[in-house]
């Protein structure tokens, strides 16, 4: 039987999971960040990624609804504001739509979800189901992929600005905000997990939750790679560059 880890040992194990399985290791991101994709492939990435962005506040609302401690809810609800925005400030969803606009995608099509890859839809729905059905501790632990986000964001912004003349720093404003939001959120979630994963069984569950979340992110990139890189098998109703870049959803 495994021994109970100290909080710092648990953190080390969680960071090791991210180092091995976070989606910065996926070949599709290497192509994206090194300028190896064409405009249509970047459009496909942004369109499909919007489904994940759209569901982030839904995920956080599901977690929030299960929190009985008002102090905990006050902290967690900031995540929803970050993505939904408020009466005076745009949130992450609006900023992602600003990116898809800048890439030449029709906003109605993006928001409709009609052109998504099935793999994208299934991965995101699996994540929503996970945080709704698993324990609160597991749901919070699944958010710990944000520990690794600042590194990939830096690579993405620098690489896309260097290699793609159709991308501007203004279009990538979403990522600038995440450089401060993600560390704040992950620091809180990590402290919560280290404090509450106080048995061998709970520690195994939080590691499994992070492993699962990494697989959700990886699966989305698998779907993109198969459809838009190689072997190029696109779901018949999914986005097709050139044909659909300005298509308005029926």
Swiss-Prot record:
Known catalytic reactions: 6-(2-amino-2-carboxyethyl)-7,8-dioxo-1,2,3,4,7,8-hexahydroquinoline-2,4-dicarboxylate + 3 O2 = pyrroloquinoline quinone + 2 H2O2 + 2 H2O + H(+)
Q: Which EC number(s) does the record attach to this protein?
A: 1.3.3.11
Keywords from the UniProt entry: Oxidoreductase, PQQ biosynthesis
Question: What class does this enzyme belong to in the EC scheme?
Answer: oxidoreductase
InterPro entries for this protein:
Haem_Oase-like_multi-hlx, PqqC, PqqC-like, Thiaminase-2/PQQC
GO MF: pyrroloquinoline-quinone synthase activity
| Pfam families named in the record | TENA_THI-4
The GO biological-process annotations, alphabetized, read as: pyrroloquinoline quinone biosynthetic process; sulfur compound metabolic process
Pathway, according to UniProt?
A: Cofactor biosynthesis; pyrroloquinoline quinone biosynthesis
Please give the Gene3D superfamilies that the UniProt record associates with this protein: Heme oxygenase-like (1.20.910.10)
The function of this protein is: Ring cyclization and eight-electron oxidation of 3a-(2-amino-2-carboxyethyl)-4,5-dioxo-4,5,6,7,8,9-hexahydroquinoline-7,9-dicarboxylic-acid to PQQ.
Q: Which family does it belong to?
A: Belongs to the PqqC family.
Its name, as the record gives it, is Pyrroloquinoline-quinone synthase
Query: What is the gene name?
Result: pqqC
């Amino acid at each position: 039987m495994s021994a109970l880890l100290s909080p710092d040992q648990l953190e080390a194990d969680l960071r090791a999971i991210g180092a091995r399985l976070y989606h910065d290791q996926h070949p599709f991101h290497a192509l994206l960040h090194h300028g190896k994709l064409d405009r249509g492939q970047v459009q496909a990435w942004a369109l499909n990624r919007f489904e994940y962005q759209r569901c982030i506040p839904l995920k956080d609302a599901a977690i929030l609804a299960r929190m009985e401690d008002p102090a905990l809810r006050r902290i967690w609800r900031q995540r929803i504001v970050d993505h939904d925005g408020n009466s005076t400030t745009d949130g992450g969803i609006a900023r992602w739509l600003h990116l898809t606009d800048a890439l030449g995608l029709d906003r109605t099509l993006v928001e409709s979800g009609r052109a998504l890859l099935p793999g994208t839809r299934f991965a995101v729905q699996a994540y929503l189901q996970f945080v709704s059905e698993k324990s609160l501790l597991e749901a919070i632990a699944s958010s710990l992929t944000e520990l690794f986000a600042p590194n990939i964001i830096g690579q993405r912004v620098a690489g896309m600005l260097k290699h793609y003349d159709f991308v501007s720093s203004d279009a990538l404003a979403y990522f600038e905000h995440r450089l401060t939001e993600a560390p704040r959120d992950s620091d809180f979630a990590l402290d919560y997990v280290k404090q509450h994963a106080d048995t061998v069984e709970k520690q195994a569950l939080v590691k499994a939750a992070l492993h699962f979340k990494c697989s959700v992110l990886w699966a989305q990139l698998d779907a993109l790679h198969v459809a838009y890189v190689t072997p190029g098998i696109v779901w018949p109703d999914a986005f097709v560059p050139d044909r659909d870049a300005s298509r308005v959803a029926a």
